[in-house]
Amino acid sequence: MTATLERRQTASLWERFCSWITSTENRLYIGWFGVLMIPTLLTATSVFIIGFIAAPPVDIDGIREPGFRSLLYGNNIITGAIVPTSNAIGIHFYPIWEAASLDEWLYNGGPYELIVLHFFIGICAYMGREWELSYRLGMRPWIAVAFSAPVAAATAVFIIYPIGQGSFSDGMPLGISGTFNFMLVFQAEHNILMHPFHMMGVAGVFGGSLFSAMHGSLVTSSLIRERTENESANNGYKFGQEYETYNIVAAHGYFGRLIFQYASFNNSRSLHFFLALWPVVCICVTALGVSTMAFNLNGFNFNQSVVDSQGRVINTWADILNRANLGIEVMHERNAHNFPLDLASEVSLPVALNKVEING
């Protein structure tokens, strides 16, 4: 009998690293997309926290009137924000080494670009990581497809809109009150409430919430008891069990009698596909709407569009909305320009009809 001894093959450091990166046995899956995601999101998060606490004033309008938005300059959690990059920079790539000094980089709002660009790369890598993990586990790729909707929305707001407007100063400030300010200014300049793509987004968000609540309540109400009536239905499910944990026939029958028969799904796969499809499609359409409004393809304007037989204007809510838009636009960037473009281009109205004479 002959025994053969072979030298044991030892994996190189790179091979062991690759095996660890792509292993699905880790507590948290890393993956090759994770190699890109982790440093970019850590960078964006770290700079955001530091800037939110201690960033110096930023000259957002490029007119030497810096705005104070960090906590150390008297703001709180509500009013604090990372101020967008200065209008003097426009849409130029503005890393630290492009500025003459660190103080100049901070004064021109360089941290905003750093955070936004790293965040954008990070969430794209997170979406790729979702696909990668699904691929390793033999799952279908629809989780990453669903996450593409918020990625598209963030891309539209933080990347496409500033490019279309010609400056990162038009981007959304990274803070609570800054977000609301961005929404008001967006409405004033683009009339987004009258844009059909925004209406689809509203239907997606509220409709998705309604559908999720309906589905969750129906499932919870039709759980299957395991053995006896004395056992709680809440304890009936065991992780990994092969059989259904709720009775879809009962849920279908209940909802069909509550509304009408064809308002409910009798197929679990089509039901859950619809629950995923509805908000994803609507949010993607809204992102497309923001992307078109970035290049000033705005919402409908029905200002003074309803007249009587004599040509006199019949005021509608569209006229009220238009007046509100003008008012918001006048208040916005009040020191950067005297009047909004659509106000300055209007025919001037007489303020006084008769000259007032003063007899002293």
Swiss-Prot record:
Record's keyword terms, sorted: Calcium, Chlorophyll, Chloroplast, Chromophore, Electron transport, Herbicide resistance, Iron, Magnesium, Manganese, Membrane, Metal-binding, Oxidoreductase, Photosynthesis, Photosystem II, Plastid, Thylakoid, Transmembrane, Transmembrane helix, Transport
Recorded topology in the membrane: Multi-pass membrane protein
EC number: 1.10.3.9
A Pfam entry, by short name: Photo_RC
Binding-site residues, pheophytin a: Y126
One GO term (biological process): photosynthetic electron transport in photosystem II
Post-translational modification (record): Tyr-161 forms a radical intermediate that is referred to as redox-active TyrZ, YZ or Y-Z. C-terminally processed by CTPA; processing is essential to allow assembly of the oxygen-evolving complex and thus photosynthetic growth.
GO molecular function: chlorophyll binding; electron transporter, transferring electrons within the cyclic electron transport pathway of photosynthesis activity; iron ion binding; oxidoreductase activity, acting on diphenols and related substances as donors, oxygen as acceptor
S-S bridge residues: none
More details: 2 of the reaction center chlorophylls (ChlD1 and ChlD2) are entirely coordinated by water.
Protein name: Photosystem II protein D1
Organism: Galdieria sulphuraria
Gene, per the UniProt record: psbA
